[in-house]
């Protein structure tokens, strides 16, 4: 297996970490170097600004159903490359069955959230909460509670034990809710 430097997806592009601060990721099978990773040199404040100013508005322009289809597309992309992921998973010491729970379980989580989003949420930008409520005695003034995406960004830190599924179970509801995410994988 060829050693690769893992890239960081930030600012809508793949960015290599500063090579002077990379960490080695050895194989649990034979100790050989599988990959190198690092986030040195990344502008984390800029990443949050980008999430708030670019990612958030782009997600909020989408309806719940559009975001659900985006999540399904991510699940399909993972399934299309699952054999590559199984090969990498093996290097962590996981059996194929272990990897199945992580990889295909992660994709299944995306499919589940996508399905729930299309079945249980409207093809709209807001979610109505309850009935109209009269706010005046005569009924000339009423109110309606709604749910809308939060402003800002979610920051998720992933664990070692399920590197795919663990990240995706956090990412799916975040995206469905219309909130951009910054994810720190275990390394």
Residue spans for each PLM region:
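N-terminal Rossmann-like NAD(P)+-binding subdomain of aldehyde/semialdehyde dehydrogenases
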Residues: 1-137
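Conserved small-residue-rich beta-alpha loop and adjacent elements
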Residues: 123-187
């Amino acid at each position: 297996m060829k050693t690769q430097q893992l890239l960081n997806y930030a600012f809508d592009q793949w960015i290599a970490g500063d090579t002077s601060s990379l960490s080695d990721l050895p194989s649990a099978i034979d100790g050989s170097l599988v990959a190198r990773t690092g986030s040195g040199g990344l502008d984390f404040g800029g990443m949050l600004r980008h999430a708030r100013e670019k990612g958030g508005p782009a997600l909020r322009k989408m309806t719940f159903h559009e975001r659900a289809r985006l999540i399904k597309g991510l699940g399909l992309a993972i399934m299309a490359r699952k054999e590559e992921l199984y090969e990498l998973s093996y290097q962590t010491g996981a059996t194929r069955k272990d990897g199945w729970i992580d990889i295909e379980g992660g994709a299944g989580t995306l499919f589940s959230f996508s399905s729930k989003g299309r079945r249980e949420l409207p093809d709209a930008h807001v979610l109505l909460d309850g009935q109209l409520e009269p706010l005046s005695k005569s009924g000339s003034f009423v109110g309606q509670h709604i749910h809308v995406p939060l402003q800002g960004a979610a920051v998720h830190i992933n664990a070692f034990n399920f590197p795919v599924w663990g990240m995706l179970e956090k990412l799916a509801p975040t995206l469905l809710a219309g909130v951009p995410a910054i994810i720190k994988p275990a390394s």
